[in-house]
Each structure stands twice: as C-alpha cells, then as structure tokens.
Amino acid sequence: MQKKRKMTLERRHNLTGWAFLSIGVILICWTSFYPMIQAFILSLKSGLGVNLKFNGFSNYARILKDPTFKGTLFNTFFYLIIQVPIMLTLALILASILNNKDLRFKGLWRTCIFLPCATSLVSYSMIFRSLFANDGFVNTVLRAVGATPIMWFSNAWTARTVIIIALIWRWTGYNMVFYLSGLQNIEYSVYEAARIDGATPRQILFKITIPLLKPTILLTTITSTNGTLQLFDESLNLTNGGPGKSTMTMSHYIYNTSFVQSPNFGYAAAMSIVILVMVAVLALIQMKVGDER
C-alpha cells in the first residue's frame, strides 16, 4: 500500500513537471518550428506576390544556376573567413589584458570596449559611412600623411574591407565579455604555478588559457558564424550591396527578392532554407571538431 502511494506521488510529480515543460515546448514549436515548416512549404511554390502555385523543387534548381546568389554566397563566406577569426582573436587578447589583476580602471575599459555592440545598427552604419566617405576622416588622415585617398565605396574589395572593419569594431567587445567571464572562472593559482615552473606567456596561453576556455571559444565561434551567415544590416546600411552587387550578402538578396524587386516569396523562402541548412551543418561540424579536441 505504501509502495503504491509512493508511486502515485512520483507520477504526480512527473506529470506536474511535464505539464510545465509542455508550455515551453508548445511555444517553441509554435514560434520556431511551425514557421520553418511553412517556409519550406512556401519554398516549393512559385509566382509573384500572393499568386503562388506549387512547382516542386524548381526554386532550389534555380538557386544552383543563379549568379547573383553565388556572388552573395561568396561575399558572405568572405566576411566569415576573414572577420570571425580576427574578431575572436582580438576579443581573446583584450579579455586577457582586462583580466590582469594589476590593471587600473578595469570597469571603464570594459565599458568602452563593450559599448559598440549596444550602439544602434543604423547609427553606427552612418558613422562608418561618414568615416570612409570620399571626404571623410579616414581620407583626411591619408592626405595629411601624404598618401593617396581611397574611394572606399567605389571598389568591391575596399567596400568589403569597410564592412569587415565595421563588424570587428561592433562585435569584438561582445565576444570579449564571454572570454573575460571564462577567464575569471580560472583559478589564478593555476597561472602562478605555471610561472613558478618556468612557463612562458606563450605556453601559458596555448597550454592553459585556450584549453580551459574551449567551451567558451566553441560557443563564440558558433554564434559568430551563425550571425555572419545571416548578415544583413551592414550590407544594406553601409554599402546597399554596392558597388553593383559586389558586397551584397545572402540575407540582403533574400530581402530584395521579397520586398524590393517583384516579390517572389517562394524563391526567397528557398534561399532561406539553404541558409538554415548551412548554419546547421557548420554548427554541427564546429561542435564535432570542438568535442574531438
């Protein structure tokens, strides 16, 4: 009898737990998975505006032949390969400097470095457009030192460089906070013991700091990769995809396909699904590599 009562009590607790959990599961399914399913169904249709008809996987076949999509894919991965490693390396260096217990005004430096990511996307894009304008601050400095001014937004490579600089400026401080939090969880006695044993700063960095920060580095790598693959604001507000479409990202192209050109929601949805698959595959690869190391 007592056993039955105990089992009933446990079952009640389990049911209560599942009842609370089910609310969150339903909300996640409704706000995340249901829109994904609808987007996939939409990607199987074609037509302009709301006049859509089912056409199978023709939108996906079109993606393989679309030169504009290939160009935006190249641009997006160019930003990813160049910007993410530089940004995360700078974030780790800054976090290591700010973790020094002898450094004065730590709070001030942390705030100053973190502040860019709290800036409005539109306002910071306008600031960078002004800085790199033909008569902007950067060209003024170049003239002052006797160098030739650069028409930053008239050339594809220099325009891409401006976007990369802007991304690094904005997001380095954000990732630095993660690294700083991880460093502060490492006992200072570990570093002291390493120094007593004669370890050099390079050995401390590669043998102690980076291995102990591996979960944090993996997290920032995945989030930064996902964010860059979905990059939109800088492409739109800084260069508007120009010159031509040489700096346009995949998300910017999806936006133009949906709302700027003749609206083709089916094709835009197909490109969105492709980005989703890329994000998922890269995240799985990064997690697999992180686990092996």
Where do the model's predicted regions map?
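A structural signal for multi-pass alpha-helical bundles of membrane permease subunits
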Residues: 4, 9-293
